[in-house]
């Protein structure tokens, strides 16, 4: 054997970077295996991080001392807070990124991480001893011993690119696919499937008629992702906005038979919420146009990413399509768009720790689990890396539940329900989104990260100072109070009931702001802006959070009822054959997870509750890894 590590991570994309960094932060001797070190942190598709739901994940990664938020701040060239006019629960931070700056910042961060080594090579096979993962073999003959492996293969597992009639075996354009690992996973008994995603053509921005287009600038007060970022280093750029036309749609309809999607060459399912331009024209044929965002890929790079027209049409048709779009009539295409098919593992094969049920020591994260998106991949990577390090060290696994974070919502959805199409995070997937806000990710998760040893000293210090300031502001707001008559002197119309109301109570009123309170108690005007904003959000949500706490208590009660691993569902009377098969496949760990399974009925769940209570199993008595 060449060398031994505690954890080996395969893949240098967003999931792999977070997995390797998390394992190393826990003290595990970690190797990141990638084809080429210079592609680590590459943004394979759109040059952006965050968005609705996705921005919440980035903030949670940051709260656990992950890298994506910090790196996005260093590489960001346009920052916007989406849904700014709506409530804080559904606001989503987003940043356009310079591809080169982002990848460079990620590579620098990993190079500075103690306990982490980069190994260039292609993973070929897993070494298994008595059913447990014990090492990794590369295609060049090198073998490594390890306590756990994290696979973050992205679109590389038997990847096949489609551009019209052209098919190219590749993990992404210009890079070879990974062929051996799919066979290894099948040999281990894991169920594999096939999914598809796509990317649009790239354009030479110097040939775009920007003067004819609507421009979208960044926010005047850009908000960073990371709590550690004190200043954003790069100038902000604007994006252009254009639309397809009826002429565009006519060209696409005339050439559908040449599209890989519509000619039958691709049979796998693509992401519902990121459809190709062919899909948009076919499914929404009554629309007169579809919006396209023209996103610069870098400060010193003329390449532009036309967000909204991913395609599998041939190159000549792509050029014809572009010529019909306002502002792009004379555009030069730097690289054609394409669709890519790849293998994935049914995520119901996994524990909520992201460890494979049939292969102890094997963890999966990212697109291999049927998700789409950088942020979804990175969040899974962090959790998988954390648990791989704990597995290698003989510790128990860590589960983030649906009431703790969007990471928990996503993983629970995956391992409980599986996927029929690439999974994307939305705020609507979370039952407790008033609690799971982007603004309070650190309050929800950083202390847990500290307890696990996942959070470093710099973040611990920043978090400690922030919480001390916030606690002091809350305490002061609850201490200061006023009568309705006193409030009236300051222009506040309160119910004349004689009751004194605290400053915190007053902030819960929709028309009362921190600025209003500063007119009564000037000390509120002296609060650090971030602390003041957080205080106001906390106050306005307080009554709703109290109600949601009861729902969370119910969730926790159900999650405390454990279903034994060895439970034979075929022998349980009262269950339909369909449910017996689903329960046997998923093997839910708790009553809560069983209740979220597709097809579960109240009667069947009541039967399982009775059985779980009779067995007397408690969550803390059951190993979670």
Swiss-Prot record:
Family matches, as SMART domains: GIDA_assoc_3
Primary location group: cytoplasm
Keyword set includes Transferase: no
Cofactors: FAD
Domain of life where this protein originates: Bacteria
Pfam families named in the record: GIDA, GIDA_C_1st, SAM_GIDA_C
Protein's UniProt keywords contain Flavoprotein: yes
Subcellular localization: Cytoplasm
Annotated positions binding FAD: 11-16
Disulfide bond annotation, renumbered to this chain: none
Gene Ontology cellular component annotations, sorted alphabetically: cytosol
Residues where NAD(+) binds: 270-284
GO terms of molecular function: flavin adenine dinucleotide binding
Keyword annotations: Cytoplasm, FAD, Flavoprotein, NAD, tRNA processing
One GO process term, biological-process aspect: tRNA methylation
Entry-linked HAMAP family: MnmG_GidA
Family: Belongs to the MnmG family.
Subunit text: Homodimer. Heterotetramer of two MnmE and two MnmG subunits.
Known function: NAD-binding protein involved in the addition of a carboxymethylaminomethyl (cmnm) group at the wobble position (U34) of certain tRNAs, forming tRNA-cmnm(5)s(2)U34.
Name this polypeptide is given: tRNA uridine 5-carboxymethylaminomethyl modification enzyme MnmG
Organism of provenance: Azorhizobium caulinodans (strain ATCC 43989 / DSM 5975 / JCM 20966 / LMG 6465 / NBRC 14845 / NCIMB 13405 / ORS 571)
